């Protein structure tokens, strides 16, 4: 229906099924933008907190869609540096990355044993990292053609728009929506 009416669309998923041949056949490469979320590269660890495709399957799906000519990105959401082997990820051949930093609430504190002391900013029920810490973390994300930040802490949004993201009009850097 979206293809028929000429609408652009964004698919954000943790499922590798989006790269199954039956789905590839119905998506329009000129209209579809796909982001596949990965929080860790460890299949076993991931299964303790996510009911989704294994990260290894998601990586394969991204590469298949990329090879097929789709506008696709890996979405590190949330990005928790202790959980992602960035060197290994950079060697996969994935071109584009969207980073969304962890925002911490009570549920997150119960699930993940990490140091939350640097999450000092508060907004809408969540603790967030200071901008300086986010910039420091981004220095480690290398080896990709494009890195974009998706920000939900309102005081940082303009920074990414004006100084970092390749497309200042679109925080997800969807190439199909670029004028």
What are these regions (language model features)?
Residues 1-137:
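Conserved AdoMet/S-adenosylmethionine-binding subsite of the radical SAM
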Residues 108-179:
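C-terminal accessory extensions appended to soluble enzyme cores
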